[in-house]
Amino acid sequence: MAQTTPGISTVRPSCVGGLYELCVGVPDLAESIAYYERFGCRAGRFGSLDSAAALALYGVDSALRSVRLHHLDADHGLVRLMQWERPRNDGLGVDPNLRCVGSRWGVRLTASVLNVANHAARAKELGQPIALIDPILAVIGEVTGEAAARPFAEPIVGVREMVVIQPLYRQVFFERFGYQSPLYGRVDPGCVMQTSQHTHAGLMIANDDHQVLRFYDEVLGLKRWFDAERPYEQATGSRTIFGLEPGETHWMVDFDDPRSGHSLEERRSGKLKIVRFAKSSRVADKLDRSRPGCLGYSLYTWRVNDLEGMWKRVQAGGATTVSDVRTDEFGARAFSFVAPDGYSWTLLQA
């Protein structure tokens, strides 16, 4: 039996809950708050840092004003809007799909994917800067390689998913068909878009070293439960969403809330989904446009049970540019770092 010393915790430092926030650099907080309200978000606490404090925590020599956006009673999948006095750059921009190293995107469940598509199509007709991937049906049996349902004979179990890319926002929406997963997203039926909190967030790498992702489960303590190759033939939705070339393969790795189970009843939202291409793939590198200080989706946060203990693990686990533990713009203790895959993160004391 392990011995313990009174007053000293033996709990391993670990992330807790689901992915906490998707951070979005914006030029105007009020305008972006109004945008996200249509997806069921509401403004919570505001906070600020001067340029010296922002440099120490985020590595950005610019004053910062932020607001956290909540969604119903969700404790994960939230949004943090970050208004930099001097942004680094304009961010990832508007591309026809999500394919690039540095890519980040947020995913929400919706009660009607066609409702979202109608708004996006109308915005495009009006000349707004927007890229749209229309709803694509992903039948679960086809994706997993199992026998799919016969049309007009058996229920089709799957999702329709679509992508909306704007200068500041990289959003994916999906609607379920033929199944329920009660802990995986809660839709606000009263908002314009009838959407949930972020059920998961994504990032993309082009790296032949599969071990680079061990950092997320072995250091941060997330639950890896899906890790598989997706050849072109099985990538029904991914072909368009990730811009696959004919015959090209890719890999998907899911890192979940440590409490999440595998059954539909036990699965929890708050997932980190990582898409990996081979290093030789033709994938643009925009990682320098996807870090704190950039406009658009530029940072993810997670909460941890022991911030100082996790700081030591991250230092020893291959991360770089690890800040000291500081106070963030909301008064929480936090530190930032760059993971071995090149992506920026901030961890907060739970």
Question: Model regions: which residues?
Answer:
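Vicinal oxygen chelate
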Residues: A2-C15, V24, F46-S48, S62, ...
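A short, acidic/glycine-rich surface segment
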Residues: G7, S51-L55, R88-G93, S181-V187, ...
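Active-site-proximal cofactor/substrate-binding loop regions of enzyme domains
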Residues: E31, F46, L69-D73, D90
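Conserved active-site tyrosine of GNAT-family acetyltransferases
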Residues: S32-E37, H119-A123, V212-D217, V314, ...
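Post-signal peptide N-terminal segment of secreted/secretory-pathway proteins
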Residues: G59, R68, L78-Q83, R88-V101, ...
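Structured core of small recognition/catalytic domains
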Residues: G190, H198-H200, H210-R303, L307-M310
